[in-house]
Amino acid sequence: MTQKVGVLAIQGGYQKHADMFKSLGVEVKLVKFNNDFDSIDRLVIPGGESTTLLNLLNKHQIFDKLYNFCSSKPVFGTCAGSIILSKGEGYLNLLDLEVQRNAYGRQVDSFVADISFNDKNITGVFIRAPKFIVVGNQVDILSKYQNSPVLLRQANILVSSFHPELTQDPTVHEYFLAM
């Protein structure tokens, strides 16, 4: 069976995720409307600005459809996408996780760091990245940076505080496809 990955495309860095999956030979659908969810098997919620993303989800009336999809299908949230999936007022509240927005600094404080994932070193690109501060016991920590979790999984949901789509390394995207 061929998988079709949806990439939420209403705000943020969705095109880089789409390009990464296409480079892996995966069919990609840019998700902008409620009916777009019906033709995908899994979804990426990209980075961007979480408050703007929430406003647009509500403006375009896709918040409920997004919630229903993410409750049962594989989903991958990067940076702002991880914030939207976590606990918080107005968020999807699907992860036993609390985040601190912009915890690694402002845009000017962006950095690149090597992190270990699945016995391999990968590059983490941190841009106004959130910090995962309260991680529930249902959440698996897959990778850390300076003792702080940066890549997590809870059941069907994968989240990263960094941007794996901004590298040439498909390791995290391949992991998501195998979930």
UniProtKB/Swiss-Prot annotation:
Domain of life from the UniProt record = Bacteria
Q: Which residues form the active site?
A: 79 (nucleophile), 163 (charge relay system), 165 (charge relay system)
Write down the Pfam families for this protein, in alphabetical order. Answer: SNO
Presence of the UniProt keyword Transcription in the record: no
Q: Which SUPFAM superfamilies does the UniProt entry name for this protein?
A: Class I glutamine amidotransferase-like (SSF52317)
Query: What pathway does the UniProt record associate with this protein?
Result: Cofactor biosynthesis; pyridoxal 5'-phosphate biosynthesis
Q: Which residues bind L-glutamine?
A: 48-50, 101, 127-128
Keywords of the record, alphabetical order, are: Glutamine amidotransferase, Hydrolase, Lyase, Pyridoxal phosphate
Q: Give EC number(s), comma-separated.
A: 4.3.3.6, 3.5.1.2
Q: Between which residues do disulfide bridges form?
A: none
Give me the reactions it catalyses: aldehydo-D-ribose 5-phosphate + D-glyceraldehyde 3-phosphate + L-glutamine = pyridoxal 5'-phosphate + L-glutamate + phosphate + 3 H2O + H(+); L-glutamine + H2O = L-glutamate + NH4(+)
One GO cellular component term of this record is: cytosol
Keyword tRNA processing included in the entry's annotation = no
**GO BP annotations listed:** glutamine catabolic process; pyridoxal phosphate biosynthetic process; pyridoxine metabolic process
| Recorded GO MF terms | glutaminase activity; pyridoxal 5'-phosphate synthase (glutamine hydrolysing) activity
Q: Which InterPro entries match?
A: Class_I_gatase-like, PdxT/SNO, PdxT/SNO_CS
Name the NCBIfam families for this protein.
Answer: PLP_synth_Pdx2, PRK13526.1
Tell me the protein family, please: Belongs to the glutaminase PdxT/SNO family.
Q: What does this protein do?
A: Catalyzes the hydrolysis of glutamine to glutamate and ammonia as part of the biosynthesis of pyridoxal 5'-phosphate. The resulting ammonia molecule is channeled to the active site of PdxS.
Quaternary form?
In the presence of PdxS, forms a dodecamer of heterodimers. Only shows activity in the heterodimer.
Q: What name does this protein carry?
A: Pyridoxal 5'-phosphate synthase subunit PdxT
